[in-house]
Amino acid sequence: MTFNLCVLTPNRIVWDSEVKEIILSTNSGQIGVLQNHAPIATALDIGILRIRLKDRWLTMALMGGFARIGNNEITILVTDAESASDINPQEAQQTLQIAEANLNKAEGKRETIEANLSLRRAKTRVEAIVETIKRIS
């Protein structure tokens, strides 16, 4: 029993295929979605999207947006999305270190907010990689 998942960014279609289950991060916590889920529209936080296919799970880093669930279709519109398999681990770790350094030297409210968002995005990318490694081992 499957349903269609479509993940879209302003520039591309990241995913458009049948899945068995997903787990995504909303602004009020994580939710799991199976076939015949009740209709819902929700804001998405920066976080991990877990996608269950027949016999394996995939992980994707989402950079915030919205999800619409209904009629066995889920459409996710996000600022950006990356499959964990497409993320370079060394580059992600380096970006995390830079984001941490930028937060430490941020001055003023605006710089601090921007640095915090950059840090959350960097942590999410690293978390997607770690999640994938855990599932493989």
Curated annotation (Swiss-Prot):
One of its GO terms (cellular component) is proton-transporting ATP synthase complex. It comes from Pisum sativum. It comes from the Eukaryota. Belongs to the ATPase epsilon chain family. Produces ATP from ADP in the presence of a proton gradient across the membrane. It is found in: Plastid, Chloroplast thylakoid membrane. Its main location: plastid. Keywords: ATP synthesis, CF(1), Chloroplast, Hydrogen ion transport, Ion transport, Membrane, Plastid, Thylakoid, Transport. Signal peptide: none annotated. Coiled coil: none annotated. F-type ATPases have 2 components, CF(1) - the catalytic core - and CF(0) - the membrane proton channel. CF(1) has five subunits: alpha(3), beta(3), gamma(1), delta(1), epsilon(1). CF(0) has three main subunits: a, b and c. This is ATP synthase epsilon chain, chloroplastic. GO terms for molecular function: ATP binding; proton-transporting ATP synthase activity, rotational mechanism. InterPro entries: ATP_synth_F1_dsu/esu, ATP_synth_F1_dsu/esu_N, ATP_synth_F1_esu_C, ATPsynth_dsu/esu_N. It is a peripheral membrane protein. HAMAP family: ATP_synth_epsil_bac (MF_00530).
